[in-house]
Amino acid sequence: MIGYLKALDDNYIWTIENDGELIVVDPSMAEEVVSKIEKENLKLKAILLTHKHGDHTGGVKLLKEKYNPVVYGPSEVKNLCTEDEVVGDGDSIEIMGMRIEIMKSNGHTEDHVSYLVDGNLFCGDSLFSAGVGRVFTGDYKSAYETMERFRKLPDDTKVYPAHEYTVSNLKFVLSLGENKRVEEELELARDVVAKGGCTLPTTIRKEKEINPFLMSKNLEEFRKLRDLKDRF
């Protein structure tokens, strides 16, 4: 069962539960995770980290001290993992009887990875609903190649980004020109957020319809869109 915990201003800590055991993805803070574990009497088996930013790793130290879970992540977070727990493109791990595949998804950071779990993509800040993460590395080629890899996933793949950016991203897409589908999605997303809900997960199929970054025809178009979004 996949769930979420809200954290900081707009972060989601994604949770995967099975038979009293728990995996958390990108725990930006420990308090919400501890509360869930204690309230539901769960055993924290593993932490999956997509990249090094503090709003994705802030809770790791306390959670490790309190529960001693296995921590997996890319080389840029090796200070939080043991050598055997550093993962990269093409690797796979098994936790709680589930096979988890690791996909390279860099661009936002140098070694950003995503985790594919039974048709569910936990993509950190590499892909958002109707958007994409800032390219802090300046490596737009890698960020565009990440979009190409995501496009090849099955359309019914569920996508779990780490932030609630859907409304602002849809507003940007509408600034590029009229789009009835995007207008409808914006209205729905606004309603969900106003009620304190979560607009995620999305799907690869849906993103192919509303996300211009994912559907960029070439690197030049992708970079132009990202530059426009940076100034939006």
Regions found by a protein language model. Name each.
Residues T15-E17, G90-V117, K152:
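Core dinuclear metal-dependent hydrolase active-site scaffold
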Residues G58-G59, S114-Y115, V132, L170:
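Active-site-flanking alpha-helical
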Residues G131-D156:
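Active-site-adjacent loop/tail segments of enzyme domains
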Residues P27-M29, K52, E76-V77, G107-T109, ...:
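Active-site metal-binding loops of divalent metal-dependent hydrolases
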Residues L8, L22, M29-I102:
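Active-site HxH/HxHxD metal-binding segment of metal-dependent hydrolases
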Residues I16, D26, H51, L63, ...:
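Divalent metal-coordination and catalytic microenvironments
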Residues E148, K152-K158, V167-F232:
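Accessory terminal helices/loops
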Residues M1-E40, V113-A130:
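Conserved beta-strand hairpin/beta-sheet module of binuclear metal-dependent hydrolase folds
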